[in-house]
């Protein structure tokens, strides 16, 4: 099969790495890709937000299957354009992608499906939202309604922070994403990610993970797109996962189908778990980044078969073969991230690292410049390892981190602490 993956981050590098292990993959193209992906697959310069351009590319390159990595092209309807042209595609329609693209839409679906989630209010008016947070008080959660690259959520621990967050959103800090705001109760507990594949009708759980949002050790500092992750997440026990499936995910999928917008692709449920009860924090309509990297490390070649079955409506007779293993990824970021950071710094030492089924460095923000690997993003590398235990995976990952010569980079040194302490 000729396969096209859309995207350019560490998530897409991990998807490409797993896909290439499957013998069904004859040719793999990633668009636009990055310097790390270019070492294992062909990369194409393509505007992945333009469905027509992507369709033409698929026709010209005899593509059999398209995997859409990021959320923005899904919300823009690229999967719809591809399906309309007769291509098999992994990723939801624009209508179904509203589960991530609009926080208010998700809340409405949860209400209809009776899925446990935080109490909330939805605002389009600045003064009303301000009055609401002043009345409710902190702690409270303020979310930009639209897509904000995973950064449009502010957990306000004081009344002043809450008011400032509302002001910031309505004053345009998150662009159009913050034109509408959802304000939620603050949920206590431990957060974990639950990943399922959906084919429009059936739901297949494919793994759990826990990421580390804060920039600093001990979960300190501002939120980021994620500084590391591990899988499985011990807090998401089989019993809690079953509860989440029956009380949250399956009712959501049934409600989406009832509305005529069946969901096809991966659904990532962010869950808050307290006293054995899961509640929905948010849905994402794509693999998490960096959670995808640890899931792919554990799934390997079968990941492609699972995605293909979801796209083809065959999940009813598909199963996941899990090993009793653990994976952990450490994000190396440019100093200054998530604020302003320097671009173009040189990374050395990558070519001495092992690359196999237990050790892999996935590239997130790199470019090859005059033969040198350079950092071009905030989150730059995902140093990923697999082991029989989480402690082994952690040790292996940090051993690789310590061999990377990049003075302008940094990472957290405690990824996995919740499960290991």
Language-model segments: residues:
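Generic long, charged, amphipathic alpha-helical segments
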Residues: 343-382
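Short acidic-hydrophobic, aromatic-tinged amphipathic segments that line or gate anion-handling sites
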Residues: 43-49, 121-125, 156
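A conserved helix-loop-beta module that forms one wall/lid of the active-site cleft
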Residues: 90-152
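Internal nucleotide-binding/catalytic subdomain
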Residues: 152-292
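Active-site "cap" helix and flanking loop/linker of ATP-utilizing ligase/carboxylase catalytic domains
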Residues: 245-267, 284-356
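Generic C-terminus detector
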Residues: 366-370, 374-421
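ATP-binding N-terminal substructure of ATP-dependent carboxylate-amine bond-forming enzymes
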Residues: 1-94
